[in-house]
Amino acid sequence: MNQLSGKIENIETKNSLSFVSIKVGTATLFAIVMQTLHNSPHLKIGNPIQVIFKATEVIISTGLVDHISLQNRLAGKIYTIESGLLMSRLLLKTEIGMLISVIPTVSVNRLELKVDSEITAMIKANNLILIK
């Protein structure tokens, strides 16, 4: 599980969906939550917030990633790789700190990932969980 500390920068709400912008270090992450300002008092601009997401929800790419709908894209390098028969655990050094990604070992091999490989870590906005 990945957990980051941030600060809410902006909130756009329509019906029961809120699109929340969170400043984490030098980057801005985006979350889509099925909560509104009325039932989630912690969702206020300027409030500190914890951003949580599973390691299996961190997508890894090599090379440029310009034409993709994912908004949460973080440049980084692979710090360590622990490869198992089916799955591999990657520790990533990104602009907002260390992240963990768990991806299929076959993908590690296909992408030729190694320690110090430059990567882009991506997380879908609806996979971010926001807590106080």
Task: Give, region by region, the residue ranges found by the protein language model.
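Long, hydrophobic N-terminal alpha-helical segment
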Residues: 2-12, 16, 22, 26
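A generic beta-sheet turn/junction motif
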Residues: 15, 24-26, 53, 85, ...
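Short, conserved beta-turn/loop elements at beta-strand boundaries and strand-helix junctions
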Residues: 11-17, 81-87
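Glycine/charge-rich catalytic "coupling/switch" loops of P-loop NTPases
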Residues: 2-5, 10, 35-73, 77-80, ...
